Curated annotation (Swiss-Prot):
Entry keywords, A to Z: Ribonucleoprotein, Ribosomal protein, RNA-binding, rRNA-binding
Pfam entry (one): Ribosomal_S7
Comp. bias intervals (Acidic residues): 1-22
Entry's Gene Ontology BP terms: ribosomal small subunit assembly; translation
Function: One of the primary rRNA binding proteins, it binds directly to 16S rRNA where it nucleates assembly of the head domain of the 30S subunit. Is located at the subunit interface close to the decoding center.
Region ranges (Disordered): 1-23
Gene field: rps7
Alphabetized InterPro entries for the sequence: Ribosomal_uS7, Ribosomal_uS7_arc, Ribosomal_uS7_CS, Ribosomal_uS7_dom, Ribosomal_uS7_dom_sf, Ribosomal_uS7_euk/arc
Keyword Transmembrane helix: no
Assembly, per entry: Part of the 30S ribosomal subunit. Contacts proteins S9 and S11.
Protein name: Small ribosomal subunit protein uS7
GO CC aspect terms: cytosolic small ribosomal subunit; ribosome
GO molecular function annotations of the record: mRNA binding; rRNA binding; structural constituent of ribosome
Keyword RNA-binding attached: yes
Organism the protein comes from: Halobacterium salinarum (strain ATCC 700922 / JCM 11081 / NRC-1)
């Protein structure tokens, strides 16, 4: 009996520690500020590809696994997109700082959770169709095709990052402010925003190629 009692105590302690760990994980916030629990999705087709977690840096654990990028937080994927080839290549901490500062600006302007603003921006900036080139007898013919949900998210992140880069490169506008403008504008479906403009252009070309 004396041997069984310590074993039971250890089991109870382990269970209590597990519950505490789960509670801490459930209450964890992105950048120590933003709640990831109550995020609403308007587009059911892209929902499974818009992962939201309190972890903003996974150390590239899914880098060599096909399609595993969809399990990475959409915030980290945006930061990865900001590390364009060139001066920003490999500067992950700098990219995360830009995203963190942009979130603060978005919250000041809209008084909303910036993660929700990002999710809405990605949903709005994701093109629904695009074109591919088919060859018939040596002649290239554009053909409209539906865009896969995962590619829609990829394209939206690209448009948002490119818009922030073009608005802040060799201009007085700070990178964080430029990104905040893109996120807020795309979330409101402002056609003057670079990301929304690129989406509409892709869909316009696809409509002409039907």
């Amino acid at each position: 009996m004396s041997d069984e009692q310590p074993a039971e105590d250890e089991t109870e302690e382990a269970a209590a520690e597990s519950e505490d760990t789960q509670e801490v994980a459930a209450n964890a916030k992105l950048f120590g500020k933003w709640d990831v629990a109550e995020i609403h999705y308007e587009d059911p087709s892209t929902r499974r590809y818009l992962a939201v977690t309190p972890v903003a840096h996974t150390m590239g654990r899914h880098a060599q696994k096909q399609f595993k990028k969809s399990e990475i937080s959409i915030v980290e994927r945006l930061a990865n997109r900001l590390m364009k080839t060139g001066a920003n290549a490999g500067k992950k901490q700098q990219a995360l700082k830009i995203v963190r500062d942009a979130f603060d600006i978005v919250h000041e302007r809209t008084d909303e959770n910036p993660i929700q603003v990002l999710v809405s921006a990605v949903e709005n900036a994701a093109p629904r169709e695009e074109t591919v080139r088919l060859k018939y007898g040596g002649i290239s013919v554009p053909q409209a095709v539906d865009t896969a949900p995962q590619r829609r998210v990829d394209q939206a992140l690209k448009f948002l990052a490119d818009g922030a880069h073009s608005a802040s490169f060799k201009t007085p506008t700070d990178a964080a402010e430029a990104l905040a403008n893109q996120l807020a504008g795309a979330a409101d479906y402002n056609v003057q925003t670079y990301a929304i403009g690129q989406k509409k252009e892709k869909e316009r070309v696809a409509a002409a190629a039907r």
